[in-house]
Structures are given as C-alpha cells and as structure tokens.
C-alpha cells in the first residue's frame, strides 16, 4: 500500500480511537519506561500520533513541548480538536523534513506502515532527529528477515512491514544510538517495542 492508501484507511476508521472499544492504556507503560531514560523534559515529537491523544497527554503532563505528525487528515482533525494548543503536521514521514532535533520521539505502531524499501531510511531520519541523549520509542514487527503483509483492520486493508530485528539493531548502532530496551511485549504476537538513546 502507498502512503496515500494508508491515509485513506485511517480516514475510514478514525472514529475507533475515540470510541470506548479502544484501550487508552495501550502503549502507556512502555512510554513511561522510555521516559525514564530522558534526563529532562524538552521537545517531543509523536510520529503517527493518530487521534486518541493519549501519548501527547502523557508527554504534556511530563512538561514536554509536544508536536504531532500524521498522514491521515481525519485523524489529525480529531487530534487538533482534542489538543488545540499542540502543533500538528499533516505529512508523510517518508518525505517530511524534521524542523529541529527532539529530546523524545515516539513512533508507536506507526512506522511499520512505511513501505518496506523506505523503512530503515525513515528510522535513520528519526535517529538523526534526536538531540544528544535523546530517546526514541518505536514498535516493529518481530521478524528476523524483512517481511511485509496486508491484512484487514476494522474492515479496511492495512499494510505492515518489518525490516527485521537484526537490521533494525544495526541501524541503531550505525546511527549513533544504543538500544536501551527490546521487548516482545505481546508474545506470541510479533509486536516488538524498542527504546533507543542517542549517545
């Protein structure tokens, strides 16, 4: 699926993240773990922020100056209504130029929708966008080798890809970052949380 097709899928299912069916605790414990590695609150970017606002709310309570980015206009419209004081970017992370370096970047359940051929380049971009000592948390498919698949999600097609854990770890090292945490947090599902820090 192309980025435009991913945006169309999320436009169609955007209301799910505002419904009682969505677990607003999803990913929060993992973010709290990642935030322990941050020396002090500064600037933060939520990549693929979606509409729920739960990660943005957590970062605001920790006194971060937060920005959000999403490719779905409908998701972002809902996010803006929830947090009108936050700067949001309607953009494709594949082509978006980060306007500055950040002390914390979240890419929770988002960059695995990036086309496989571009995935490691996007990760390199995010790593380069970290301030010294900055921390990133992101999710990936827990595969050894590159894989991609399109499956139904809430009645819509949704693409996921993984460059493979070995390639991701090499990219972290090459990008001047240390892996601080790697966890198959929904085992036996292949959902992996990674936390890395710029050295």
Predicted regions located by residue number:
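Class I (Rossmann-like) S-adenosyl-L-methionine-dependent methyltransferase catalytic domain
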Residues: 1-43, 50-100, 117-121, 125, ...
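Hydrophobic adenine-recognition pocket in adenosine-nucleotide-binding enzymes
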Residues: 110
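A conserved beta-strand element that flanks and buttresses the S-adenosyl-L-methionine
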Residues: 106-107
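Helix-to-beta-strand junctions that scaffold the AdoMet/dcAdoMet cofactor pocket
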Residues: 114-116, 130-131
């Amino acid at each position: 699926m192309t980025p435009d097709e991913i945006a169309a899928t999320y436009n169609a299912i955007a209301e799910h993240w505002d419904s009682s069916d969505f677990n607003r605790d999803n990913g929060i414990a993992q973010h709290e773990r990642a935030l322990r590695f941050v020396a002090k609150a500064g600037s933060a970017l939520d990549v693929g922020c979606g509409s729920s606002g739960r990660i943005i709310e957590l970062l605001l309570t920790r006194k971060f100056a937060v920005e959000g980015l999403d490719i779905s206009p409908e998701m972002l419209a809902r996010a803006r209504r929830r947090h009108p004081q936050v700067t949001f970017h309607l953009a494709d992370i594949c082509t978006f130029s980060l306007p500055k370096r950040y002390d914390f970047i979240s890419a929770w359940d988002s960059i695995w929708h990036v086309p496989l051929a571009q995935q490691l380049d996007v990760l390199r971009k995010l790593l380069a966008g970290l301030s010294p000592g900055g921390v990133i948390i992101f999710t990936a498919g827990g595969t050894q080798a590159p894989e991609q698949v399109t499956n139904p999600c809430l009645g819509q097609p949704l693409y996921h890809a993984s460059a493979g854990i070995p390639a991701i770890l090499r990219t972290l090292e090459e990008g001047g970052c240390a892996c601080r945490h790697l966890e198959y947090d929904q085992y036996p599902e292949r959902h992996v949380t990674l936390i890395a820090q710029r050295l």
